[in-house]
Amino acid sequence: NSRIIAMYRIKNESRWIKQSLQSISDICEEIVILDDGSTDDTVKICENFPQVVEIHSQKELPFDETRDKNNLLKMALSRNPDFILTLDGDEVLMSNSKQRLFYELNVLYPNVNLFQLKALCVWDKPNQYRCDGVYNTTWSKKLFRLKDQPKNLQFKGTDFPGNSHCSAFPDNLIGKNEIVRSKVKFLHYGYYDEKLRRKKYEFLQKL
């Protein structure tokens, strides 16, 4: 099977990070993590997973999404992956993902470099998803192939404060004109309850 390395950029994700890491533990050979100053048990939870081979912790740095993504990318590339999977700490792959994902990567689409996964937005209850409006069309760029890619892959800055809304894939990645929408889905807990929704709104307002 292809060698997949996962990379996470997280902060205070102790509520969901264990589920997230468990969901990819049989898919990703190794996992690298950039922790942006967590004050909860996030790092301690991550350290309990043997697949987590590197945790870079930073504190009191100004928010800079591009800087963090480039640091994470360097960490992941140093592990010599065939693919890089990018996840947030509140995202959990569904349990039927492994066989389906490897079949797509190696058999169905061996020459495609970019893959989107469908997000299911968990809402108020563990088995309840929102599927109205924009919540029914949420595809996220999550996985990219490294074969024949430039050696100097990087994310570029944006015109937004803190380089927010940075690209999901490195800007000089080859093959952006063809993106496969995978059958693999993931659960997104970022809007699970009113407290989280308010927290997300306030964070975005600051930007």
Ranges and model annotations:
Residues 15, 60-69:
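A short, glycine-/small-residue-rich helix N-cap motif at loop->alpha-helix starts
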Residues 35-45, 61-62:
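A conserved acidic beta->alpha catalytic loop
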Residues 80-94:
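Short beta-strand-to-loop acidic/aromatic patch adjacent to the donor-nucleotide binding site
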Residues 24, 29-37, 57-58:
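Short beta-strand/loop segment that forms part of the nucleotide-sugar
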Residues 10-27:
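Short, well-formed alpha-helical segments that are part of the catalytic scaffolds
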Residues 70-83:
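Active-site nucleotide-sugar/metal-binding loop of Leloir-type enzymes
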Residues 65-70, 94-207:
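Catalytic-site signature of metal-activated, phosphate-bearing donor transferases
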Residues 3-5:
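Cell-envelope/extracellular polymer assembly enzymes that use nucleotide-activated donors
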